[in-house]
Amino acid sequence: MTEDRPARVLALGDSYTIGTGVDPDERWVSKLANRLRADGESVADPVVIAENGWTTDDLDGAIDEQDPQGPFDLVTLLIGANNCFQEEPPATFEPKFRAMLDRALGFAPNPESVVVLTVPDYTLTPVGEENDPDEHAERLERYNEIVREGARAEGTRLVDVVPSSKRVAEDESLIADDDLHPAPAQHDLWLERIYPVAAAALD
C-alpha cells in the first residue's frame, strides 16, 4: 500500500464471508473495513468473492470467472464449511484447501498479507443439531487442523473464530433467523479477533 492510494482488500469465502442472514453492512468484512477507516486507514471497498453454499470447488471457479486483479494489500480466506457439511472426507478437503490457499497467496504481496480464518463450528446451531452433530464436529475438527497447518506451513496469519462460534450454545442471539448463520452480534465477535490481525497485516 502507498500513501496515494487506499488499501485494497480481497475477501474469499462462502456464506460466512458474504454474510448470509445479515445485511451487507453487518457482515464482518464490511465491519472490518469500517473499523480500519475509523482508525485512520484509507481502505477501498473490499472485493468479496463469496456466496452461500460455496465449497472450495465453487470458490475456485468463481475466482477464475471474476478474475480479480491483484495485488491486494490484504487477502482473507474462510472456506470449508460446505465441504464439511456435504461430508467430504478430510483427506479430500486438504489438497483443495491448500489449492485455495495458494490462490489467496497469489493475490497478496507476501504471506503475512494473507489472513486465514478457521471454519466456524456450525454443529451447535439448531440446523447443525439436526444433522448428526457429533459426526460433523469430529470432521470439522480435522478440517480446522488442516486449515491451521496450511497457514503455518505458508507463513500466513491465522484467526481462530471457532471459540466465538461455539458461544451460540449459550446465547441464541448470536444465531441469525435462519437458525444456522451468524447474527450481527456474532460478526462483531469475529471482528474483535480479526481486526488486530488485519491491522497488523496492513502495517
Predicted features and spans:
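Serine-esterase "nucleophile elbow" of acetyl-processing enzymes
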Residues: 1-52, 62-69
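Alpha-helical cap/lid subdomain in secreted, periplasmic
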Residues: 61-203
